[in-house]
């Protein structure tokens, strides 16, 4: 939540860390709410919307009193203790900052989605089914919801396969088609999940508009670590030089034969020029990129490049679904 509601330079600053500690404390508090008999409240009464309502309707003094009254072994105590280490005159600003991050829970629909426990994240690994996660490409306010879905689904399915399935593999192949990947939201630690999902009978496809967009979303080596987990790369076309240079380098070098012709030219009506050099022709071998970046950029729309691990690149023709014989 904090990562997907932060700017490029905010994710690791003081305010974000302080808000994260308070958020963790409140989540642990709400998740473990019990009735007078000591039983956990229904799941519908222990949602993220309740966290937002606490910070929106209660003073920081009331919140602190509730958290301080918890037993020492309660999981909310440690993050709350870290929050209290901030100066007291900063507490109000931290609460306001966290409230702004959770403002999306003012929407009843968002509150309903996160409050009800009716999405079985393990179902795709048990029987064939399809989950569609549809979000706006223009409005980023709800992106952390889609990032929460995938951040929970990947490790939960992996743990289910490892601990409860025969041979450590899901009985049904589970595929993640992550179209418009950079608009899903930031997925923390996704490279580690992608590294191991094959062994659990899972697969994934990441679709991005350009590498520069991917690099902006996952700076440093993050995007490269994610890309390295895939064995096939399909290039459909691009308009940015970063992607073109990357594809050009991935295609590798080829050896070409160069033919040089030399023919002496005698100036007309020149009494002083004479040449005894004969006509000559030389052949040599040199290297060049299989496809230069400008050639990658100019690739015809009806063609695509496929890069396979351990094999030479393939230049193929695209086919629309309507061209398939069995398309209905």
Which residue stretches match the model-derived regions?
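P-loop NTPase motor domains
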Residues: 1-202, 217-218, 228, 286-318, ...
């Amino acid at each position: 939540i904090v990562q997907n509601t932060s700017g490029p330079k905010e994710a690791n600053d003081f305010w974000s860390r302080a808000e994260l500690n308070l958020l963790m404390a409140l989540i642990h508090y709400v998740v473990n709410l019990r009735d007078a008999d000591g039983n956990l409240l229904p799941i519908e009464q222990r949602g993220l919307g309740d966290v937002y309502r606490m910070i929106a309707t209660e003073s920081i003094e009331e919140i602190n009193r509730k958290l301080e009254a918890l037993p020492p072994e309660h999981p909310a105590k440690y993050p709350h203790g870290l929050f209290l280490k901030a100066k007291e005159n900063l507490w109000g600003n931290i609460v306001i900052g966290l409230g702004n991050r959770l403002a999306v829970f003012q929407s009843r629909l968002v509150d309903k989605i996160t409050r009800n426990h009716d999405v079985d994240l393990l179902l795709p690994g048990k029987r064939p089914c399809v989950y569609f996660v549809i979000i706006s490409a223009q409005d980023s306010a709800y992106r952390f919801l889609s990032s929460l879905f995938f951040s929970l689904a990947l490790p939960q399915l992996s743990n289910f396969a490892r601990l409860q399935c025969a041979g450590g593999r899901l009985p049904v192949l589970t595929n993640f088609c992550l179209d418009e990947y950079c608009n899903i939201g930031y997925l923390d630690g996704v490279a580690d999940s992608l590294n191991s999902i094959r062994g659990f009978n899972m697969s994934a496809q990441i679709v991005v508009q350009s590498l520069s967009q991917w690099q902006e979303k996952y700076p440093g080596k993050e995007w490269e670590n994610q890309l390295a987990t895939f064995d096939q790369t399909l290039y459909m076309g691009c308009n940015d030089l970063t992607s073109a240079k990357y594809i050009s380098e991935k295609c590798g070098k080829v050896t070409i034969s160069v033919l040089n012709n030399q023919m002496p030219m005698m100036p007309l009506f020149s009494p002083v020029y004479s040449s005894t050099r004969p006509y000559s022709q030389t052949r040599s071998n040199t290297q060049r990129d299989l496809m230069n970046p400008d050639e990658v950029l100019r690739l015809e729309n009806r063609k695509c490049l496929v890069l396979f691990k351990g094999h030479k690149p393939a230049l193929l023709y695209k086919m629309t679904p309507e061209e398939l014989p069995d398309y209905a």
